[in-house]
From Swiss-Prot:
Classification via HAMAP family: FTHFS
Amino-acid positions noted as binding ATP in the UniProt annotation, renumbered to this chain: T65, P66, A67, G68, E69, G70, K71, S72
Protein name: Formate--tetrahydrofolate ligase
PROSITE patterns per the UniProt record, alphabetical: FTHFS_1, FTHFS_2
Record-level Gene Ontology MF annotations: ATP binding; formate-tetrahydrofolate ligase activity
Reaction catalysis annotation: (6S)-5,6,7,8-tetrahydrofolate + formate + ATP = (6R)-10-formyltetrahydrofolate + ADP + phosphate
Length: 555
């Protein structure tokens, strides 16, 4: 049986005018800034805050296979299912990055009949937010180099500039570059490098800001580097926070689109969860909470990455508690964690599912540590067998875990009604949400708590560089920031080949980065890179555009 591709399904779908989608949740035309017929930005200053804000449902997942487990698909499908049940609901998603779109994953707007549209536009540039973030980031780099070239009044040590340029592409050749070459007229030579745009602190700041004033304040606190006597230099010292915020004045506005079934969806911000905090913007989530009774959102990768950062970074900053958490599981991921090779994941193997269930179990237990009841969603794939699915259901029953088989890829919202009903039962109950750690703990203790309680490790080792940074950060007054771990998404450890639910391992912190504008400290583990590379056969090889301008092969 031949199945339509996600792109084919998207192209066959009928979109409603964006003003009608807006009207369905009470957004006036006055608050709407259309980008064509089917996309718009929202002027948040024209949205009336409400006292009883909508409840937030977070969607996370077990440790994924390289192809991903359909977290965005389940997020959209669950919201469509709430729509089926006549609930007032909105979706809040991250915007896909171009680099992974051309690399390994293809597009990232859901799949099958649980997609957000217009899919082509969202995956390719969308409303220009990533361009604005990239421009603001690189403008700051230009201001830094110009300041040094023009006499360096602040005494910036060009050997200790922490700020890097960015590009929305996977490009390993740009990880380390030299700039300012070619003689005195071209600036002062120094080592530099590029990160991918979604790892930019500007991206994190945009996603954690509540207003333009807040955005400007956070930008002003960015530490760009150090003087020759090791004193931090900030954007405020350069006096360019106003210019950078101006570049972002439209990008800070949430983007409104729709699901195939017409569920209003806000797509805004896109930090990765393995190298950044992995959540969509606070402004989009809070705007949705002012417009809907239920807001379904997601955080990147598993509970060890996006969900932990959602709880310990985003929720602290935003000031709301999650009402429920969905953990997406797939039979193929369970088999992978049970020892099955990638090429054999389509074959029935109940024993491998049994062996791999330990990975899902740890993710479920991680959510419980935050005081929220998890609901497992088995995201159905066509190669799953009844025996494999029944084993997972029996495991859930034995362990008193809520679970639902979810067929939203195939059936849209109707395929997610069972999941929606389970989530509704959790939403109606009080929870005892709490972050994993107190901010007053020293940085090393916060890192150790994440490693031992969420990852299952036994010890954290800090490189000599990281040890020096811990001391310096404490002296600078940065000890009370939350921690943003940069770690492989494929394993609880910092070794991506260590699957299942390993324990007793050590994690090495090789380096720390102070994101004083965004307000967190990044701890880099293992070989994690903030500028990814492309695979040997990138997804781009299967992409094209027709003579009349329609994309081909975009997932």
């Amino acid at each position: 049986m031949t199945h339509l591709s996600d792109l084919d399904i998207a192209n066959q779908s009928t979109l409603q005018p964006i003003k009608d989608i807006a009207a369905s949740v009470g957004i006036s035309e006055d608050a709407l800034e259309p980008y064509g017929h089917y996309k718009a930005k929202i002027d948040i200053n024209k949205i009336t805050p409400r006292e009883n804000k909508g409840k937030v449902v977070l969607v996370t997942a077990m440790s994924p296979t390289p192809a991903g487990e359909g977290k965005s698909t389940v997020t959209v499908g669950l919201a469509d299912a709430f729509h089926e049940l006549n609930k007032n609901v909105m979706v809040a998603l991250r915007e896909p990055a171009l680099g992974p779109t051309f690399g390994i994953k293809g597009g990232a707007t859901g799949g099958g009949y649980a997609q957000v549209l217009p899919m082509e536009d969202i995956n390719l540039h969308f409303n220009g937010d990533f361009h604005a973030i990239t421009t603001a980031n690189n403008a700051l780099s230009a201001f830094i180099d110009n300041h040094i070239h023009q006499g360096n009044e602040l005494g910036i040590d060009q050997r200790r500039i922490e700020w890097k340029r960015v590009l929305d592409m996977n490009d390993r050749a740009l990880r380390h570059v030299n700039v300012g070459l070619g003689g005195p007229t071209n600036g002062v030579p120094r080592e530099d490098g590029f990160n991918i745009t979604v790892a930019s602190e500007i991206m994190a700041i945009l996603c954690l800001s509540r207003s333009i004033k807040d955005l400007k304040d956070k930008i002003s606190r960015i530490t760009i580097g150090y003087t020759r006597d090791r004193k931090p230099v900030t954007v405020a010292d350069l006096k360019v926070e106003g210019a950078l915020a101006m570049i972002l004045k439209d990008a800070i506005k949430p983007n409104l689109v729709q699901s195939i079934e017409g569920t209003p969806t806000l797509v805004h911000g896109g930090p990765f969860a393995n190298i950044a905090h992995g959540c969509n913007s606070i402004l989009a989530t809070e705007t949705a909470r002012d417009l809907a009774d239920i807001v379904v959102t997601e955080a990147g990768f598993g509970s060890d990455l996006g969900a932990e950062k959602f709880m310990d970074i985003k929720v602290r900053e935003a000031g709301f508690d999650p009402a429920a958490v969905v953990v997406v599981a797939t039979i193929r991921a369970l088999k992978m964690h049970g020892g099955v090779a990638k090429d054999n994941l389509k074959e029935e193997n109940v024993e491998a599912v049994k062996a791999g269930i330990v990975n899902l179990e740890r993710h479920v237990n991680n959510i419980k540590k935050f005081g929220v009841e998890p609901v497992v969603a088995i995201n159905a794939f066509i190669h799953d067998t009844d025996a494999e699915v029944e084993y997972v259901k029996s495991w859930a029953k034995e362990n008193n875990v809520r679970i639902a088989l979810t067929e939203v890829w195939k059936k849209g919202g109707k395929g997610g009604v069972d999941l929606a009903n389970e989530v509704l039962e959790v939403i109606d109950q009080p929870n005892s949400f709490k972050p994993l750690y107190e901010l007053e703990l020293p940085l090393e203790q916060k890192i150790e708590k994440i490693v031992t309680e969420i990852y299952g490790g036994s010890k954290v080792t800090f490189s000599s560089k990281a040890q020096k940074q811990l001391k310096q950060f404490k002296e600078n007054g940065w000890d009370n920031y939350p921690v943003c771990m940069a770690k492989t998404q494929y394993s609880f450890s910092d070794d991506q080949t260590l699957l299942g639910a390993p324990s007793g391992f050590e994690i090495t912190i090789r380096e720390l980065e102070a994101k004083t504008g965004a307000g967190f400290i990044v701890a880099l583990t293992g070989a994690i890179m903030t500028m990814p590379g492309l695979p040997k056969k990138p997804a781009a090889l299967n992409m094209d555009v027709t003579d009349d301008g329609h994309a081909i092969g975009l997932f």
